[in-house]
Structures are given as C-alpha cells and as structure tokens.
Regions:
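Extracellular repeat-rich scaffold modules on cell surfaces
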Residues: 102, 172, 243-246, 250-252
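Periodic glycine anchor positions in long extracellular repeat architectures
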Residues: 34, 40-43, 58-61, 105, ...
Length: 253
C-alpha cells in the first residue's frame, strides 16, 4: 500500500482582527519512540519525546518537506499575523518559557523566545535557544537521511529591530551537536563530541556534496535574514558554556 507524504506542518494563530495573537495555553506533550514532529505553540509548554529523529518547536513555526522524497526541507520558528503570512511586532507575541526533553537520536529543537530549558540525550542534535531556521539540501546521505545546508538564528519583527532573547538552559549528551543559544544570558553544557556552540546569534553552513561543516560565524541579522544590524540594537548575553572531550568550536559572542 502507498503511504502519504507529508508536505508541511504549520502553526496558525487566527484572530478576528487578523493582526493580534490569541490567548495561548500551557501544554503538556509526551510522545513515544519514533520520528516525531511537535509544535508546542505559544505558552509555557512541557514537551517530552522519547528516542528518534525528532523535530520540536517550542513556540510557533513551520516545517516543510521535499515533494518527491518526503525528506525534511526547512524547519523555522516564526511569529505570524492572523493571515499566517508576515511577522508582526514581537511585543504582541506571548512567548513561552518551555521545558523540552528528548531521548537519544538526531533531534532538531527550536525552542523559540522565552527562558527555555532544553535537555537532549545522545545524538547529532541541532538546538536553537531562540529564533532561527534549519534549511536542508535537496539530497540524502547514504542512509537516506536529509543533509543539512544551513542552520541560522534570526530575529524577526515588523520593524527590523532586535527582539530580546531568552535566558536559556541547554544541555546535550554525547554526539556532534550544533547549538546556537541566541541572545540572552544562556547556560550551555555539551558532552563529548565534535560540537559547535554559538553563545549568541550566528549561522553554520554545510558543504553541498559531503554535508560536512563548511563555515561557522557569529552574526546579528535583520529580519530580511542577511544584513547586519547596528550592534547597539543587540541585547547580547553573558553566557556560561561547558564542553566535554572532543574537537569543539565555541564562539561565545
């Protein structure tokens, strides 16, 4: 029998006026083994997923999949107006202080704005403490897994100005993890592995053919996603970063 291929998963906040956020809930979400997709939405959520290659968004966002293969194409956190299209002023967003825990596996976690606690076990994990996206290449590796192209933080609002980042606590297990904590006073602990840790904003790009890490940079982007804003607008963080054994790259910001 044929199996349907998922095209996209998107959170939508609809209001009568089309421009303001609805009241949100503090959700408790638990899943078992398997490759899960979870969008917590706004509010103080508690999300626990077991082993598997999971995708978790602590607040609002979208996940799209490649049309033919069904592999992951893009994962992004975003705060949308009632029409579901353009970002609104971040002052209107009731963000959540989320608690996110996962089992072993290659997880992607975009915690979103707020003071989040993220705990991830062993695996080649990608964790963004605040806003950002993971863009995949249009190819798979030898195991049939989607290959990353870019992982980046981004701060979006209607006025191209910075959003206050959260004071996040991020802990990962053994494995080659990628962590972009984002703005705010963050506490980051990674275990053994060839880890990449950015204490504030930045991006990592990957080689097209091999999928190996190509470029790592710390930067602060406007809401177009490419031009650097004046540093006086950035509310940077006093971060605490601890790593285990391995060939780590750390840019504290």
């Amino acid at each position: 029998e044929g199996t349907s291929i998922l095209a996209s998963v998107v959170s939508i906040n609809l209001s009568t006026g089309g421009q303001t956020f609805l009241p949100t809930g503090s959700d408790t979400i638990s899943t078992g083994l398997g490759n899960d997709v979870v969008i917590g939405g706004l509010g103080n959520d508690e999300i626990t997923v077991a082993g598997g290659d999971n995708i978790i968004l602590g607040d609002d966002g979208a996940i799209t999949f490649q049309a033919t293969s069904g592999l992951t194409d893009r994962i992004e956190s975003r705060y949308l107006d009632g029409a579901g299209a353009s970002p609104i002023d971040a002052s209107e967003a009731v963000v959540g202080n989320d608690t996110i825990s996962t089992g072993s596996g290659d997880d992607v976690v975009l915690a979103g704005l707020g003071d989040d606690v993220v705990t991830i076990l062993d695996g080649a994990n990608v964790v963004l403490g605040d806003e950002g996206f993971a863009q995949y290449q249009d190819q798979a590796d030898t195991s049939g897994t989607a290959v990353l192209g870019t992982v980046s933080s981004q701060y979006l609002d209607g006025a191209m100005s910075f959003v206050q980042g959260g004071a996040d606590s991020i802990t990962t297990g053994d494995g080659d993890d990628t962590v972009i904590a984002g703005l705010g006073n963050d506490d980051i602990t990674v275990a053994d592995g060839a880890n990449i840790v950015l204490g504030d904003g930045g991006s990592i790009t990957y080689q097209l053919t091999s999928g190996l890490r190509d470029r790592i940079e710390s930067r602060y982007l406007d809401d177009a996603g490419f031009a650097a804003l004046d540093a006086t607008e950035a509310v940077v963080g006093n971060d605490t970063i601890s790593t285990g054994s391995g060939d780590d790259v750390v840019l504290a910001g």
